[in-house]
């Protein structure tokens, strides 16, 4: 419905970011294809000839996260992933497992979101982690596939008396400004978000209808 509203306003282009239901979004866009409005999908790759994709290599991001945690000695690791129905979340998780495997580290615990990543998801993930490990030693590190989720996990751990990184290490994803605004500051995997935005706008401007 939202896409139909945008099209009705004679827009020059559409940039879609953080698509949750990829199948439904693609179908809605294809139904409006005759309007010849340029469409840019940000953050994941969707193989439709009339769409442009601007995305980083999500598999490589996962590998980098796994290799980093493995290289500093972590053997028992947890992660909070995006919704399993999304390709980007699956790619990051596959890469993460492969990166850990290079250091004989184990992905011991996984929390898959059922909705878009946000602060509440991070709190829910940490609650689930604590429930699953009640009376047992926690994994030594957590990779949150979003800095907002990482900040929520940090808050939950701190509230429960755990120290980051002394008791448990925490790694985020995206490298947004929030990482420097929390205590302690978050380690994170960098995403070139400014460059992604600039490239998306460039594509729209070059392909907007006459």
What are these regions (language model features)?
Residues 1, 19-20, 44, 53-64, ...:
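Hinge/beta->alpha junction and helix N-cap segments in small-molecule ligand-binding domains
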Residues 1-67, 71, 131:
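Alpha-helical recognition/docking segments in bacterial nutrient-uptake
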Residues 12, 74-76, 140:
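Short acidic/polar active-site loop segments enriched in Thr and Asp
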Residues 31-34, 101, 158:
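Anion (oxyanion) recognition and catalysis
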Residues 127-210:
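Flexible loop/turn connectors
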């Amino acid at each position: 419905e939202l896409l139909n509203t945008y099209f009705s306003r004679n827009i020059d282009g559409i940039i879609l970011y953080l698509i949750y239901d990829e199948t439904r979004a693609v179908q809605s866009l294809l139904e409006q294809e005759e309007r010849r409005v340029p469409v840019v999908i940000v953050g994941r790759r969707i193989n439709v000839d009339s769409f442009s994709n601007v995305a980083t290599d999500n598999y490589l991001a996962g590998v980098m996260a796994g290799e980093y945690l493995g290289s500093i000695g972590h053997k028992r690791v947890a992660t909070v992933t995006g919704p399993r129905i999304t390709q980007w979340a699956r790619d990051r998780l596959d890469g993460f497992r492969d990166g850990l495997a290079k250091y004989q580290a184990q992905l011991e615990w996984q929390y898959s979101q059922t909705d878009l990543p946000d602060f509440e998801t991070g709190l829910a993930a940490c609650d689930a982690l604590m429930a699953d490990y009640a009376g047992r030693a926690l994994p030594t590190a957590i990779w949150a596939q979003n800095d907002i989720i990482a900040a929520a996990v940090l808050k939950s751990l701190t509230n429960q008396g755990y120290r980051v990184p002394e008791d448990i290490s925490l790694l985020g994803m995206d490298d947004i400004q929030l990482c420097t605004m929390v205590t302690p500051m978050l380690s994170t995997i960098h995403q070139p978000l400014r460059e992604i935005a600039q490239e998306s706008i460039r594509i729209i401007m070059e392909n907007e209808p006459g």
